Amino acid sequence: MTTLFRIESDRLCLRCGQAGLDESRPLTAADESRFRGWLQDYHNPSRGYGNEPARLRLGRELYAWLDGDAGWLARSRATAPAPWIVDFRGPRDPDGLTRLFLQLPWELLADDRGHLAADLALRYT
C-alpha cells in the first residue's frame, strides 16, 4: 500500500486508499518558514548530518507536522502492511513552497520509538 502526499496549489493532499484517506489541508506562510528552518538545520553540520540527537529531533518534528491534527500518519500506519511506502509528489513545474517540501529529509521521519526507517517490522520506504 502506498501513502501519497502531494502538493496541489496551496494545499497538502493525502491519499491512502487502503485506509480510506483522501484529505487535504492548507499550506501557509508559517509552513514555508518551518520548511526553511528544517532544511537549514539539516544542512548545518552541528545540528544535522553528524548529530544523531538533532536528526532524531528533526525526524520527530517532521512526523508531528505531517501527522497534523487529523493524525494522517497514525491513521495510514494503522492499516499499512509492510512495507509501508510513502510517496511525496508535487506538480511538474513546482513553485518555491513545493520545492522546499520535496527537499525535506523525509528519510528521517521518526516517532517516539525512533526513526521509521529503522523499524524492521514497518519497513518504511
Question: For each of these PLM feature ranges, what is it?
Answer:
Residues 1-125:
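Non-catalytic, solvent-exposed interaction/assembly segments
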